[in-house]
Amino acid sequence: MSQPDTPAVKISRHTIVSGGSVLDAVYAEPTSVPIRCVLLICHGIGEIVDRWLPVQRLLAANGAASLVFDYSGYGRSRGRVTAAQFEDDAVAAFQHLQTLAPNAPTALLGFSLGTGVAAAAICRTDAQRLVLCAGFPSFEAAAWSFGIPRWWTRLVPPIWRIEESLRGCSIPILVVHGENDRMFPLKLGKELHALCGTGAKLHIASMYGHNEPFRDPRLDYWGPIVDWLAGDRTADTMELQTLLSGAQRARDTL
């Protein structure tokens, strides 16, 4: 795969109406290589679109067009901060993305707490694939991982339960989780994968922590995702890529 600065990448800013909210979004697309796939990225709750631009450039350089948006009340976006509104925002952003790239296969990708949003919104879109990165099986499980005592469970809203969100969902699902994720340990990633159905694939990113994939985007993390979205690789090849990338990162630390 090519390096991010090889092909030209076009970046554009967009405003999206989501009910009573107005969302800020950034779209990145390749201009020197064909578009292999298109994806909407639901980022983590503590992030904003500008921090995802390096990821978008890397994706575009390798044939993946992407739209990243800020939820209502985040960054430049205006509106009420609620879980239901975040889900509405994802649906509105997905519909907007389809107008930008109408002839390409379109997927939904959630990262961190954005996995809850993406999974909850997926059945309200016609996305062809779903990717859940650095995620969790339920918001309660995420809260416990943050350190909230289990006896405070009644204070945690019963939202973003993957099993409920994906009930009846039949599209291909890829779960990606960092081997060294401390915020949402690998155990949560495996639990998430188990709830996604027998056809879901699990890709363990060797030696990756929680925030590394967007703070320091590299092809050994994002490359297999693009390949899977484009339908270029089988599960066995992805497992081989996992081993090879882990070996390379191990050598880099020596």
Residue ranges and their predicted role:
Residues 208-219:
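Catalytic histidine-centered segment of alpha/beta-hydrolase-like enzymes
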Residues 59-78:
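Conserved alpha/beta-hydrolase
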Residues 55, 162, 171, 185-194:
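Short alpha-helix in the alpha/beta-hydrolase fold that links the catalytic acid
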Residues 81-100:
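Alpha/beta-hydrolase active-site loop
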Residues 1-17, 24-26, 234-254:
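An N-terminal hydrophobic leader/cap segment in hydrolases
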Residues 45-57:
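The serine-hydrolase catalytic nucleophile loop
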Residues 169-170, 175-177, 181:
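Short beta-strand/loop motif that positions the catalytic acidic residue
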Residues 179-184, 211-212:
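Acidic catalytic loop of the alpha/beta-hydrolase fold
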